[in-house]
């Protein structure tokens, strides 16, 4: 292939990737703006099922309980929908590179939100409770508390130490790190999470200003009828006030959007610590994260980790492997390479790899945690999480140099936003 043909092929591939990125962003936005209608459909289902219920069976229930439930679902959907539309309206310039794409044809399936997109909206609302509601305080204490305490133990708060928080979600852990006097940058890949965290951090909300109803999607395992329709108010604190409480002048806080390995591909020995919570198992191949964190840490730097090994890219159906491999073992069109190359490791295997990379394990213990748990549900998932600190040995005689502004590489869809 000639150089001209190679350049043309690369340009075509980049254009296709950018177009797909725009369609993906449209699906995310559409899932936010279409959330209310999706929940209202559940209210209609309740009404239809109630209408078919035999009168003698309906008489066994509290008076009008099903009608009240349907009305409550609609009211909760409207409140959540208003919040999600505000998130979209407040995104500013945040989005794919090149600005907003031209409107897609309504029939174009690439621009239409899928059930997976709506599922991520529901997960984002649950994460609002975990990170930004008083109801999530106990879960934050169990998950974030040990990490924050360990950072203070192993990383000096000298005004120069910088901590990277990959898989930052809605950014509460990053904010708590910065509030303790560290420079902190969070990294997140999900547009759903990034849009919502941008709004919560930068919209100037007052404490407990917004009432969300995050558990309307959980009709099962309710102890009381009202539990499903209860409100959680966000944010429990004003982000800027939390940062100011850390003292030490202007806080060093930012969020970087994009896939972890790509965003930080060109950085080396740039961070004093990496604080990871429920993150390692998001990798198709966790060994790549181990190698990347080693490269990113300065000599003497610490990797503080808490989380399970619930690997995200384990194929659960044939649809995950749709397209598969060609005769030469290469992914075909339509196949998600992350499913195709995913490898899962036990803790003892991952521990061996961490030590083989060169880390020294200075803490290793198990902690019970939940993740976006509904505290009033009759069913919750309890994780027995590995909590460890791995230190990159300091080179003998090396004088460590603080890097206040490491070089960043942003691929498609990457951006940075800071707390106003």
Task: Please provide the spans of the model-predicted regions.
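Single conserved hydrophobic/aromatic residue that forms the stacking wall/gate
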Residues: 401-420
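N-terminal accessory segments
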Residues: 1-157, 161, 170-171, 179
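Conserved beta-strand signature within the Rossmann-like core of class I S-adenosyl-L-methionine
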Residues: 300-310
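Core SAM-dependent methyltransferase catalytic element
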Residues: 357, 371-400
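S-adenosyl-L-methionine
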Residues: 203-265
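A short glycine-rich, Lys/Arg-flanked "PGG" loop and its adjoining helix->strand segment in the class I
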Residues: 288-299
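A short SAM/SAH-binding and catalytic strip from SAM-dependent methyltransferases
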Residues: 273-286
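Short alpha-helix
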Residues: 238-240, 341-358
């Amino acid at each position: 292939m000639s150089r001209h043909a190679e350049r043309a092929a690369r340009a075509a591939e980049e254009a296709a990737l950018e177009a797909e990125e725009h369609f993906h962003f449209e699906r995310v936005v559409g899932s936010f703006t279409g959330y209310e209608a999706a929940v209202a459909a559940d209210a209609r289902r309740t009404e239809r099922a109630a209408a078919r219920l035999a009168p003698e069976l309906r008489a066994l229930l509290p008076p009008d309980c099903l009608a009240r439930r349907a009305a409550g679902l609609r009211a909760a959907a409207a409140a959540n929908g208003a919040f999600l539309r505000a998130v979209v309206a407040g995104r500013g310039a945040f989005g794919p590179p090149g600005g907003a794409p031209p409107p897609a044809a309504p029939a174009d399936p690439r621009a239409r939100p899928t059930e997976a997109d709506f599922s991520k909206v529901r997960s984002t609302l649950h994460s609002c409770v975990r990170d930004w509601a008083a109801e999530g305080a106990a879960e934050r204490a169990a998950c974030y508390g040990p990490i924050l305490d360990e950072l203070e133990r192993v990383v000096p708060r000298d005004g120069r130490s910088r901590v990277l928080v990959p898989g930052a979600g809605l950014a509460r852990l990053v904010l708590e790190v910065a509030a303790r006097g560290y420079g902190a940058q969070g990294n997140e890949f999900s547009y759903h999470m990034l849009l919502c965290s941008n709004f919560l951090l930068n919209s100037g909300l007052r404490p407990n200003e917004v009432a969300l109803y995050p558990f309307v999607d959980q009709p099962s395992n309710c102890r009381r009828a009202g539990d499903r329709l209860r409100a959680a108010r966000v944010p429990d604190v004003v982000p800027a006030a939390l940062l100011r409480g850390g003292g030490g002048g202007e806080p060093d806080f930012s969020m970087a959007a994009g896939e972890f390995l790509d965003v930080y591909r060109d950085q080396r020995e740039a961070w004093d610590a990496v604080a990871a919570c429920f993150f390692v198992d998001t990798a198709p191949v966790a060994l790549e994260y181990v190698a990347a964190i080693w490269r990113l840490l300065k000599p003497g730097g610490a990797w503080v980790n808490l989380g399970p090994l619930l690997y995200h890219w384990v194929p659960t159906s044939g649809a995950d492997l749709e397209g598969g491999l060609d005769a030469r073992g290469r992914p075909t069109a339509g196949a998600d390479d992350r499913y195709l190359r995913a490898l899962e490791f036990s803790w003892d295997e991952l521990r061996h790899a961490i030590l083989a990379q060169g880390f020294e394990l200075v803490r290793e213990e198990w902690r019970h945690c939940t993740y976006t748990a509904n505290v009033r549900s009759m069913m919750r998932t309890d994780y027995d999480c590995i909590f460890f600190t791995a230190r990159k040995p300091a080179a003998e005689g090396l004088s460590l140099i603080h890097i206040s502004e490491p070089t960043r590489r942003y691929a498609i869809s990457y951006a940075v936003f800071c707390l106003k």
